Amino acid sequence: MAQSVPPGDINTQPSQKIVFNAPYDDKHTYHIKITNAGGRRIGWAIKTTNMRRLSVDPPCGVLDPKEKVLMAVSCDTFNAATEDLNNDRITIEWTNTPDGAAKQFRREWFQGDGMVRRKNLPIEYNL
């Protein structure tokens, strides 16, 4: 059963952090590539620490082995002088899909007893 095998690795480009540059009076969009480097189909989902400022499209999906997806992380306008910019990040969570599951994302894959892996990408704001 897929849930007893730990999910393989993913690769992200960029691999360490996301950087948004001032000015912040316009919406900025940064693209991230996620690659399933493992040998099994995975379901993935993105979480953000600041849903008011950061949005992700698509927020979840399914990747076959070696398959890639390009997603957009958008930063809405904000006042850099009054906002706390220290702890923003996005977190990519992924888990193996059940054997025989259709290639359609299902939130319940993350709610069972299967292993879920996480990768954090801090957000850096250049002022």
UniProtKB/Swiss-Prot annotation:
Q: Which residues form the MSP domain?
A: 9-126
- Chain segments annotated as transmembrane: none
Q: Name one GO cellular component term.
A: cytoskeleton
Is this entry keyworded Cytoplasm? Answer: yes
Which compartment or compartments is the protein found in?
Cell projection, Pseudopodium; Cytoplasm, Cytoskeleton
Pfam families annotated for this entry?
A: Motile_Sperm
Tell me which InterPro entries the record gives.
Ig-like_fold, MSP_dom, Nematode_MSP, PapD-like_sf
Gene3D superfamilies associated with the record: Immunoglobulins
User: Which residues are modified to N-acetylalanine?
Assistant: 2
- UniProt keyword Acetylation present: yes
* Tissue specificity remark: Sperm.
Which sequence ranges form a coiled-coil region, renumbered to this chain? none
Q: What keyword terms does UniProt attach to this protein?
A: Acetylation, Cell projection, Cytoplasm, Cytoskeleton
**Subunit structure, interactors included:** Forms filaments 10 nm wide, with a characteristic substructure repeating axially at 9 nm.
Job description of the protein: Central component in molecular interactions underlying sperm crawling. Forms an extensive filament system that extends from sperm villipoda, along the leading edge of the pseudopod.
Stated name of the protein: Major sperm protein isoform alpha
What's the source species for this entry?
Ascaris suum (Pig roundworm)
